[in-house]
Amino acid sequence: MKIYTFGAENAPVILLLPGTCCHWKGNFGHVIPLLTESFRVLCVSYDGFDETETTEFPTMIEETEKIEAYIQENCGGHIRAAYGCSLGGSFVGLLAARRNIHMDYGILGSSDLDQASAFTAKLQTNLLLPMIYPLIRDGQFKSRFLQKQMEKRAAEMGDYVKAFMGMFGGARPYVTKQSCKNQFYSDLITPPPDKIDIPGTEIHIFYALKMGEKYRARYEQHFANPVIHEQDLQHEELLACYPEQWAALVKQIAEGNENEVQN
């Protein structure tokens, strides 16, 4: 695992955590410059997904431990905020609940927080991986049907599908199938605890309403008092398609400007 740093060393720290099988630049490369005016930005590049390393993703807990160790060693165990894109939101929940480091603000970006039994998780992973892994490795689906469906959706939905696919980071032949498998499976069997309530930590959730109503209940299940920002958008559409608005909202939250924060 690597953590890339940007901005002034004495600025408040914001930690960025990528989504499932995503490259850190694909997720956050376009917004990091918008944050470095105010923050020292730390961007995680997970084991198995960084082109400069020969590693494989282990488990959610092992990766969380590495993130905690870095924050303890380099930030005195305290950061201003953490933003998790999709899967990254699971890390935000785990980091908050484990209490080995402290964050003033934890922000989940459209995270689904899906969970399953070990048996079901293994089944889902084994079904999904043959479809998704070629996209990670080659930058496109192996199945002509899936590729055509994706192109059709892109034509129907405009910039969103193109921007969303770009968040994966293009073809990455160095990513192993085992890393993808470990990340899918481990995320499903490692849910955050229920009713997380940490003194001094505010949890904010970017709730993409077009994902469906069930996610509101899920957020309220796992967090005792989440601040839910309703957005009439698709999964991580704010980050993918509206970077200036995303950065403005993240900065308002992390700077504690509650009266300026708009849902």
Across the structure, where does each feature detected by a protein language model lie?
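Conserved HGGG/HGGXW glycine-rich cap/lid loop of the alpha/beta-hydrolase fold
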Residues: 4-53
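Active-site loop/oxyanion-hole signature of alpha/beta-hydrolase fold enzymes
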Residues: 42-81
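Short beta-strand immediately N-terminal to the catalytic nucleophile in serine-hydrolase-like folds
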Residues: 82-84, 109
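Gly/Ala-rich beta-loop-alpha elbow adjacent to hydrolase catalytic centers
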Residues: 84-92
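Flexible "cap/lid" loop of the alpha/beta hydrolase fold
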Residues: 97, 105-136
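Conserved alpha/beta-hydrolase catalytic His-Asp/Glu region
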Residues: 117, 139-196
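Conserved serine/cysteine hydrolase catalytic core
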Residues: 178-221
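Catalytic histidine-centered segment of alpha/beta-hydrolase-like enzymes
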Residues: 233-246
